[in-house]
Amino acid sequence: MLTLEVCCYSLACAEIAQAAGADRIELCASQQDGGITPSYGTLVGCRERVSVPVHPIIRPRSGDFCYSDSEFALMKCDLALVRDLGFPGAVIGLLDEEGHIDLRRMGELMALAGPMAVTFHRAFDMCANPLQALSQLTDLGIARILTSGQQQTAEAGLPLLRQLQQASRGPLIMAGAGVRLSNLHKFSGIGLQEVHTSAGHCVPSTMRYRKAGVSMSHAENDEFSHYCVDGGMVEAMKSALQMMETVGCSI
């Protein structure tokens, strides 16, 4: 059966995802930035209260994946912390100025990660040569690659996802970006073993008083709602995957 990884942006989201049947959690902060390294408190809370595997992302900022020396130093500190807290895996990714895998720095992080299972995240979708990158990540010992097939959505990227799945001699290819209940069968149909979803929705604030005209970020953002995992959607996706496994074919 396809493994269902759910992207979570808080401890509360992780607990919802776990209760709904997620097989694994990618733990991030800041959904509006595409996911950055979660706080120490969130990491500790997840270690204490979440029993399914949790893989925190190690990403010091939003934007591209070509990092300065100081940013890379932060990544090493954060990865060592995640390792020492006992997480079974971590999610990382670095590119150089030409859009190739930053082999030297990735090698340093892999050595630092030790026994943790390392996912190379969607920096892969920004690399210049995906098949070369797959070979390099295989040599580095990466456990899985999270990718949309270098398209805006994984469904649009199905041709490259199929090619990567057929070519991989090591890393699992995990589809992510726009993975939904309605298209799960398409990823199973090309032989993938894992999918990644946010399965999220906006939850309204409990505040009754709402100050108008002031924003803590972008003016167009709603300060009185936050993004959270939709437990019902995770349950529905998990049920669909179980049904696909039971009947032994795509639905």
From Swiss-Prot:
InterPro entries: CutC-like, CutC-like_dom_sf. One of its GO terms (molecular function) is copper ion binding. It comes from the Bacteria. The keyword Cell membrane does not apply. One of its GO terms (cellular component) is cytoplasm. Keywords: Cytoplasm. The keyword Nucleus does not apply. It is found in: Cytoplasm. HAMAP family: CutC. Belongs to the CutC family. PANTHER family: COPPER HOMEOSTASIS PROTEIN CUTC, COPPER HOMEOSTASIS PROTEIN CUTC HOMOLOG. This is PF03932 family protein CutC. The lineage of its organism: Bacteria, Pseudomonadati, Pseudomonadota, Gammaproteobacteria, Enterobacterales. The gene is cutC.
